Amino acid sequence: VGTILADIKNNGDERMSDSTVYSYIKALKEIFVIEDSIAWNPNLRSKTAIRTSDTRYFIDSSIATAALGIGPKDLINDMETFGFIFETLAVRDLRIYSDALDGKVYHYRDKNNLECDAVVHLRNGSYGLVEVKIGGSELIREGAESLKALSSKIDSTKMKTPSFLMVLTGIGDFAYKRPEDGVLVVPIGCLRP
């Protein structure tokens, strides 16, 4: 809520209270416009502080594009915004497919800004780490490195190791496993429950 209030104040409206923002968020959740992704709190070898605030997503990424008044050409010209919109779409798809497997999707971020866009967690304790990237070899490499860094911090004496590490991309015709590290690279169109 603090971030939302800061954004509102930066846009010139200082009259909105915390309770008003909370009531709007509650209403948007009730009509299925937004959904929170809860922070994942694994057992780590280090004592790194984990950020436990929820990440809020539009249930349908087209709501964000409509609210911003942008279309495909605008997104092509603003790849940063396109990346945020694509992440919303990807997390929504992961939630739908995870739900079919009686699973949940979380997110992870620590004080050192090591993050994981999605942690797909099943009831049997199995989980996978997912980094969402539009595509391109450099972004895929960055995503794989981030996933491997997080995976290496997990204390496998206290919990299972990840079942998979996956970079979920917006482009590509087929999924593959990187030979150098076993990280899966999966186009969003290849996802299935």
Task: Give each language-model segment a name.
Residues 1-126:
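Accessory nucleic acid-recognition modules appended to NTPase machines
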Residues 66, 139-141, 174-178:
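Switch/connector loops and helix/strand junctions flanking conserved nucleotide-binding motifs
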Residues 97-100, 148-161:
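Arginine/glycine-rich "motif VI" loop of SF2 helicases in the C-terminal RecA-like domain
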Residues 109, 167-169:
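Short beta-strand/turn micro-motifs composed of small residues
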Residues 125-127, 160-164:
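Short glycine-/polar-rich loops that comprise or flank the Walker A/P-loop
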Residues 127-138:
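Active-site ExK catalytic segment of metal-dependent nucleases
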Residues 136-147:
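Active-site-adjacent loop/helix micro-motif of nuclease/hydrolase catalytic cores
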Residues 170-193:
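Domain-level recognition of nuclease-like catalytic cores that cleave nucleotide substrates
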